């Protein structure tokens, strides 16, 4: 089975959400459901997700925005996965 997560999204808006709202953004497989996305991210990065929002971008990519629990720091996770 291939990975549902294609890559972390690194934009100015994504960085603001990471800094101020404890959220991370990923480009994911267009057929992935919210539950599948949550399970994949939680198991891969060993974090707890509070909420997941998805949208299809104008370039036909699926963007997932996940809000992390207060116990997890989005900046630490981003550093671990190579965003910085």
Curated annotation (Swiss-Prot):
The keyword Phosphoprotein does not apply. One of its GO terms (biological process) is translation. Gene3D superfamilies: 3.30.70.330. GO terms for molecular function: rRNA binding; structural constituent of ribosome. Keywords: Ribonucleoprotein, Ribosomal protein, RNA-binding, rRNA-binding. The keyword RNA-binding applies. Transmembrane segments: none annotated. Signal peptide: none annotated. It holds the Pfam family Ribosomal_L23. GO terms for cellular component: ribonucleoprotein complex; ribosome. Belongs to the universal ribosomal protein uL23 family. Binds to 23S rRNA. One of the proteins that surrounds the polypeptide exit tunnel on the outside of the ribosome. Part of the 50S ribosomal subunit. Contacts protein L29. This is Large ribosomal subunit protein uL23. The gene is rpl23.
């Amino acid at each position: 089975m291939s990975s549902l997560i294609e890559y972390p999204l690194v934009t100015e808006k994504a960085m603001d959400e990471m800094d101020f709202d404890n959220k991370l953004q990923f480009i994911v497989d267009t057929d992935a459901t919210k539950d599948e996305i949550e399970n994949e991210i939680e198991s891969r990065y060993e974090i707890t997700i509070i909420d997941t929002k998805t949208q299809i971008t104008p370039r036909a990519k699926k963007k997932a925005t996940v809000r992390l629990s207060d116990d997890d720091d989005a900046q630490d996770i981003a550093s671990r996965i190579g965003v910085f």
